[in-house]
UniProtKB/Swiss-Prot annotation:
Protein name (Swiss-Prot/TrEMBL): Methylenetetrahydrofolate--tRNA-(uracil-5-)-methyltransferase TrmFO
Keyword NAD attached: yes
Subcellular localization: Cytoplasm
Record keywords, A-Z: Cytoplasm, FAD, Flavoprotein, Methyltransferase, NAD, NADP, Transferase, tRNA processing
Source organism (scientific name): Thermotoga neapolitana (strain ATCC 49049 / DSM 4359 / NBRC 107923 / NS-E)
Function: Catalyzes the folate-dependent formation of 5-methyl-uridine at position 54 (M-5-U54) in all tRNAs.
Amino acid sequence: MVVNVIGAGLAGSEVVYNLGKRGVKVRLYEMRPKKMTEVHKTGYFAELVCSNSFKSEEVTNAEGLLKAEMKMMGSVVLEVAERTRVPSGKALAVDRNAFARKVTEIIEDMENVEIVREEVTSFNPDEGIWIVATGPATSEGLLSFLKELLGEDFLFFFDAVSPIVSFESIDMSRAFWGDRFGKGNDYINCPLTQEEYEELWKALVEAEVIEMEDFDRSLLFERCQPVEEIARSGKDALRYGPLRPTGLVDPRTGKEPYAVVQLRREDKEGKFYSLVGFQTRLKWGEQKKVIQKIPCLRNAEIVRYGVMHRNIYINSPRVLDPFFRLKKHPSVFFAGQITGVEGYMESAASGIYVAYNVYRILRGLSPLRLPEETMMGALFSYIIEKVEGDLKPMYANFGLLPPLSVRVRNKFERRKRLAERAMKAMREFLEKNPW
């Protein structure tokens, strides 16, 4: 039997890789580059359209624990991320082009994988296994078909990305290298005095935004709030948010600046840097004016402007079973952000989970849920079963995990124990139920 996968994002790539390497015949449909979305720039698989950061690798951080579990199950995304990483302190960040190019090469070289560069606008859910991993920018043609298949409309939220500037245009005479609390030198820090900060804040709140159809501030995703929306919530909101100076000492003064704009490397050569926390929907001309209010970026060359886009997803608790199959059509699976998980790693992890159970089904075995003590198990359980009302996108966090049997007051120690329990549960699960 051929397994059909629609969409070669992070989730789709994990599905294809994990099935293909186990001898399963896979037909992968990807419409890019023949038909592009409003946010993609290339035809590569696993293209990163927002940040180039996969966040923390420490297991006492929810994102780090999620990665540890993914590695235990097997993840092509993390394998390639290790090979294409760029310096980013305690976070795992990648050269976005090298990363996507390598994932594409690996999948293209797989003998069991047939790649079809065409848009899918419909399919027969009763013929074979179908895995929909088309992400938040699913094409209108397929959306129409899926609405009919699901019998209900999609949910959506708004997301935004940050601008990227060239390194050679940054004024390094004022900027300084460093991570918070002296834990590395991977970020470029652009310090602001109180006067400079207030000038930047004023420019942000007065800047014109690009109007969007159906735009609603309540539908902005909390971890990707546009910088201008944060600014409008109060004069000091940015200074206690993405521009907080905590743990960053300017070597010129020996003190923490009033505020700091951080820049994160985008590529291995260090030619391009993104503005951390500067997701925006400002008009492009306004973005340039605002960025030039930052002294270190007065002459900045903007190589990619920030944009906002609408992300769609299904109401998973209503339409999916615990294995991410359609309740109406058990041979149709969903994976990735279209299910309501939020984040790069969360999307990739859902692809691994779907691939695991599809492989079991193909071998005549029953699908299995992951232990709820694991971050993956708890996240997927939440998405499917633990939501009241309409689903809101959810990312990995320790609040999803069942509490420890004993109360631990110290936050770090509590997270450490939760992580140890999660990894033990995943290890035992995979020993008992290997791929």
